[in-house]
């Protein structure tokens, strides 16, 4: 058994919007999680809702980056919705026929791990087969006065989580003139959303479990793709969510083995993808 940990830090270079499940009127709130904190005023422990970035948000973004890159390296055009979801969204478990009793096809799982290294890292489901990912993506924990007792490297960090929250707004404008009279004004709706302000810091961790050399190299490739498009959260198309990545230990890995493997096995991998597409059209 081998476990590799890569601890790092994220710093917001532009406001981050990572929406939670709740709204307040027309305001979209950021994700907060109940946390035992130390009240900075009296030093006593209490429970409060503290902002965080969900690990699934980071994992999902990295999945899309590495899978798009994987198909580009193969010059492969995918023609199956189910296989697309298998590669890009985590897939769907389903029975293949009424007689399916949930039997696991070990040969298929082995070929998936061998020929699609990104899936071996992030996991997925196809038909009745589930492939567990070897990559664990932690939550990005905000660095603030309320949580610094969890963080050994930030003893002197005194910004409250409440001071790190911001807000912004946008408008939706109905400009379809043909649907209203000439003297009628266009309807405009204002919406608001919470953000975490520029300069907010997070601690974060990746864990690789029992990965072979190609899978480790694939992880490095994934991280390099993130560095090329260093965003997190929503509304990145309008400038939100740009982050500075600082994971010095990942520099010990190289993406050479992964790129070489994909190049040398391109035909074999494409044929396997064709097989999957025929079964799960």
Where are these regions (language model features)?
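RNA-binding basic/glycine-rich loop and surface signature characteristic of RAMP-family CRISPR effectors
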Residues: 1-281
């Amino acid at each position: 058994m081998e476990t590799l940990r890569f601890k790092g830090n994220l710093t917001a270079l532009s406001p981050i919007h990572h929406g939670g499940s709740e709204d307040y009127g027309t305001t979209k709130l950021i994700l907060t999680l109940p946390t035992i904190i130390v009240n900075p005023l009296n030093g006593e422990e209490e429970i409060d809702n503290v902002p965080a970035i969900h690990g699934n948000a980071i994992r999902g973004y990295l999945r899309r980056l590495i899978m798009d890159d994987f198909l580009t390296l193969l010059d492969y055009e995918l023609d199956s919705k189910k296989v697309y979801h298998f590669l890009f969204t985590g897939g769907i478990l389903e029975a293949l026929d009424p007689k399916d009793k949930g039997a696991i096809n070990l040969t298929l799982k082995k070929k998936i791990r061998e020929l699609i290294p990104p899936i071996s890292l992030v996991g997925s489901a196809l038909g009745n087969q589930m492939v567990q990912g070897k990559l664990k993506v932690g939550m990005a924990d905000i660095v603030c006065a309320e949580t610094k007792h969890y963080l050994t490297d930030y003893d002197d960090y005194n910004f409250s989580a409440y001071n790190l929250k911001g807000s912004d707004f946008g408008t939706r404008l109905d400009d379809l003139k043909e649907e209203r009279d000439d003297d009628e004004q266009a309807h405009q709706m204002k919406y608001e959303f919470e953000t975490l302000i520029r300069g907010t810091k997070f601690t974060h961790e990746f864990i690789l479990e029992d990965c072979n050399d190609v899978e480790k190299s694939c992880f490095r490739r994934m991280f390099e793709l993130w560095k090329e498009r260093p965003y997190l959260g929503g509304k990145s198309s309008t400038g939100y969510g740009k982050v500075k990545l600082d994971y010095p230990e990942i520099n010990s890995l190289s993406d050479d083995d992964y790129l070489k493997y994909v190049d040398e096995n391109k035909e074999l991998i494409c044929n396997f993808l064709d097989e999957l597409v025929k079964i799960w059209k």
